């Protein structure tokens, strides 16, 4: 502890300057540092452990000494977690030890009681000559003595554990020449770095729980290892336990290590965490930490029929709704599969194939829904156009996602279980326990993710209900403080745990690779692009990534990977450029125009294409023939405006059975002399009495004259003959009762009317006028039989192309074509989709 730090007592507020102190290892083993009586005793106690081990091995044998040191380790571990825990709890709540020292004047000069003499002697021998214990507050003196007992317990705890591990090593050193030793040594080295870096950050003050006694008036910068894991001294600070267990290859050591680590977590939960909340308040989160939870509440408040979704949480489910059938279906399916395993005993091969196929298919379904929802709002539109609400579509997605998760993990569970009970599978207990630990890590990771982003984030709510997000910023609290995408690695830890449990069976390796690949695809190619689009390109940097970026070699490797990614991206972009540039070249014939129109989608490019087509295509006429469209000055017609064609042909070319057809130029571009496609009823006679039985086609003839030299007339295509699909069309005059083309008009464009969606009432009025003009209204409702060319499908297309809103046939039929209800629905859908943008 630095001498320039200012501290103050917790209750009285007395300020003082703490003396310089040293860490545990230097205090005990550095010969240049003064040693107190207790420190000498601690050192002798540690040496006695080794002497006792050597003597005991000679006298009692290996098995007895392993039991003896296991008992010692358990004793000292309980002294640590229970003894120190109780002492700190009393000090935190009641300041028991400092108050005792004050009441009994333990550090008062002239007090000759045995306790006071011993405590004062201990501090005098420990501290430098310049330290005046009588002028310092009792809180500091008690803490300095408390450190001595902590040193004894912690060093004995460590020493007895290490001796127990040593006694559990394989008899043959050659048995340790494997991958487990390499991984174990790496974990031990990592553990050492964690402890050293943690002490660099918190110093002796926090290492010895100084804030239980007094408070420092300084800001600690929690960087380094504190960016990697929550409570690193209690979590990853015990990685060495598992590294030593791997090296030993003894599951007894692993179980002892797990027990010791578990006791440490209990110490954290019941001693440290409550004190932190009392002293510093609950852990502060970023301003957006509660946004997702608030969104869940907002959804439930605004939608009275909404209830929290069922969520798979390992071997249990949360939010089970007794009145929701899908919950029974999900749970029932999982239970049925487990019963099937025990009753039918399916083969391992069948279970593997079924698990692999199910995971593959459900991943495709989930990825497809998320991708289409992100790019097109497809899933929401699917339900909106069928008369359902936005939140209802989200509820259906929640069921799909959770059911897929339950189904695949249930199948993985029974597949692993069947593999374990297979006669050909060797169960190595150490690997099996490590596999269970990985499953526990995944369960913990999922719980932390849900705690950080709530149900809304767990079910990708920002894909479906982005309009419910009040502040669009990514959360950086909880597990997301350390990992940017924790589900990518820790989210499949349990799946790789099954690989360890089954002794690296190829089936479970294949399943783990599939799980990891699917997770990677969702995060890298779907989730990250969507997050960038919704929240901006300022990506969140996790604590682990931030720490690694501070390391030179890792930073250079990261820069190299970024360059490779940029090269790949640019190469893909350059391959696309020639195609894009080709679209910009002018089209000089009608075939090029149509290819051009297929690609161009926005309105400006569409208008340019129309100009290109009309400007470069002339009507094709026989000599002395006339074939003109009236009022073609604007080169376009807004539906359902009637179109009149004036025609004239020499008498020798005229035939009473001649007719005029309306075609999309994309269909007729291949042949200008013969029409090879059907007009599908979009045709008119040129003579009023030519085609008996085709009344609507004859009624289109408005003028007809014939003399000795020419025949001429007018034909008007109204809503009963026009196409209601936007595009570029042409009229063709056919000679006689054939498909031989005599005349072709100039191309023109058919456009949909612009409807006003300012209010449902205005839209209702305009729709009613439009449908009346095309004879598709009966009793104020849409009548799909009123105009054979204005069917329900055409009405859907009109609404989609003109208003950008889709309605399903089922919905239109459900409301019986009610224009008012349809108008209300269109405005609602449009508002929802606009809010999602």
Swiss-Prot record:
Pathway stated in the Swiss-Prot or TrEMBL entry: Phospholipid metabolism; phosphatidylcholine biosynthesis
Topology within the bilayer: Multi-pass membrane protein
Principal place of residence: endoplasmic reticulum
Recorded GO CC terms: endoplasmic reticulum membrane
Reactions the enzyme catalyzes: a 1,2-diacyl-sn-glycero-3-phosphoethanolamine + S-adenosyl-L-methionine = a 1,2-diacyl-sn-glycero-3-phospho-N-methylethanolamine + S-adenosyl-L-homocysteine + H(+)
Subcellular location: Endoplasmic reticulum membrane
Pfam families: PEMT (PF04191)
Function, in words: Catalyzes the first step of the methylation pathway of phosphatidylcholine biosynthesis, the SAM-dependent methylation of phosphatidylethanolamine (PE) to phosphatidylmonomethylethanolamine (PMME).
Xref: HAMAP family: PEMT
Protein family according to the UniProt entry: Belongs to the class VI-like SAM-binding methyltransferase superfamily. CHO2 family.
Protein name: Phosphatidylethanolamine N-methyltransferase
Lineage, highest ranks first: Eukaryota, Fungi, Dikarya, Ascomycota, Saccharomycotina
